[in-house]
């Protein structure tokens, strides 16, 4: 398995910026333009795999829902497991949950109770890091079920929002934007 970039490629050219979505004043970074380009998506996953492989994970955890798009193919590429962190009512069987605060309210994440064996090395993935609340809560939830969280990875980091400061694990961001 090779993690070499087939060609130098600026992946930011494959991210579409959509103003005022999902609401006025928000600039949305659309990754659908990246994942539908076979060449760009291969380069992106190769670059992520190179960093994540060094953390030697047993399993990758994807945050609902766009984190699944990154974590699942990377787990396949790295030969490790994949599990999902989801909103309430989306996972069958017994789940463990964690409520966490947002700027304007509260949210909740769930994981299947048997998804992680105690001591397994886990990397958590999402599409974008903004304020860091969801990623920090995901790390806490994974630890609650006995995971050793060895890193976090995102496609896009919005550096000005300082979400990285809420994390106590190494973070890999494929692309960084300053607003």
UniProtKB/Swiss-Prot annotation:
One Pfam family in the UniProt entry: Pribosyltran
Any single GO CC term annotated in Swiss-Prot or TrEMBL for this entry: cytoplasm
Gene Ontology biological process terms from the UniProt entry: adenine salvage; AMP salvage; purine ribonucleoside salvage
Listed EC numbers: 2.4.2.7
Domain of life per record: Bacteria
Enzyme class name: transferase
Gene Ontology MF, one: adenine binding
Entries under CDD domains matching the protein: PRTases_typeI (cd06223)
SUPFAM superfamilies in alphabetical order: PRTase-like
Family: Belongs to the purine/pyrimidine phosphoribosyltransferase family.
Annotated function: Catalyzes a salvage reaction resulting in the formation of AMP, that is energically less costly than de novo synthesis.
The protein's name in its UniProt record: Adenine phosphoribosyltransferase
Taxonomic lineage: Bacteria, Pseudomonadati, Pseudomonadota, Alphaproteobacteria, Acetobacterales
């Amino acid at each position: 398995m090779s993690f070499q970039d087939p060609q130098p490629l600026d992946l930011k050219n494959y991210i579409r910026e959509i103003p005022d979505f999902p609401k006025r004043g928000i600039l949305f970074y659309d990754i659908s333009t990246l994942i539908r380009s076979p060449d760009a998506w291969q380069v992106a996953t190769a670059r992520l795999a190179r960093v994540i492989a060094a953390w030697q994970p047993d399993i990758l955890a994807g945050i609902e829902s766009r984190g699944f798009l990154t974590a699942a193919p990377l787990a396949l590429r790295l030969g490790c497991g994949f599990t999902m962190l989801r909103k309430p009512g989306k996972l069958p069987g017994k789940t463990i949950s964690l409520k966490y605060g947002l700027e304007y309210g509260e949210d909740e994440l769930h994981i299947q109770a048997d998804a992680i064996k105690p001591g397994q090395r886990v990397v958590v993935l999402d599409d974008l890091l903004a304020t860091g609340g969801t990623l920090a809560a995901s790390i806490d939830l994974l630890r609650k079920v006995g995971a050793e969280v060895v890193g976090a990875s995102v496609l896009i980091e919005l550096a000005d929002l300082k979400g990285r400061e809420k994390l106590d694990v190494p973070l890999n961001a494929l692309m960084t934007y300053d607003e």
